[in-house]
Amino acid sequence: MCAALGIELEELSDWNCCGATHVSNELVAAGLAARNMAQTDLPIMTPCSICYSNLRSAAQRLEDVEVRERVNAVLDQKYIGANIRHALDVILESLAKKDERIVLPLKELKVAPYYGCLLTRPAGLYSPQFPTILEELIGRLEAQPVALRHKTSCCGGPIFMPQEKAANDIAFAILAEAKAAGAEVIVTVCPLCHLMLDAKQKVLEQKMGREIGIPVLYVTQLVGIALGLGPEELGLFMNSVSPMPVVERAYERIAKE
């Protein structure tokens, strides 16, 4: 999908965890993030909201001279600053309004935008409670964004291990709201959110005794469909809830025009 939009990617040669697994120790977490950020002068794009939030949080901590000096004392490459961007932001910047590369406009497709709790934190780039960047992207694909009250709520993933029932209740509430709002598909910008809403959806249906059956697409998959990329290229057959009926309806709508 990035290639189709002219986005050139260069993977970090020796990346490590973003620091999320060590958040209880702010200095270690900042050091892990700084080690990643120090490896390149290019903007760093991540498709994971957890990584995005941790890298941005670390960058803010590293503005403190004392913290930066303590971290740099143990790094081979010294951290001097970084430009951290989420894939959603880069995609939107690369996709013009009425973009000619959109060969399959997703007209009439009702899409529920789900941000999750970390894309907008730390604050500064997007409104923490009322972000609209995902709705703007959905609009550029000519689909219809569906209002979702829980769009910035946690998916339940971070508490799944210690509090499975609470996590299940949270995830199911998001799915049920999207279904009730008439959404044909949910689009996510975080792999953990995608796991909770897609991979666990059938398990949640069994536990709650209610069928939802709503496909969940990661944002690159939704954009890729509009760009005319094939199901295999986009990994659509790897989704737990098949999005193929949604894709087929999109083609049928185009054929009728």
Label the predicted regions.
Residues 1-257:
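Iron-sulfur cluster-binding electron-transfer modules in prokaryotic oxidoreductases
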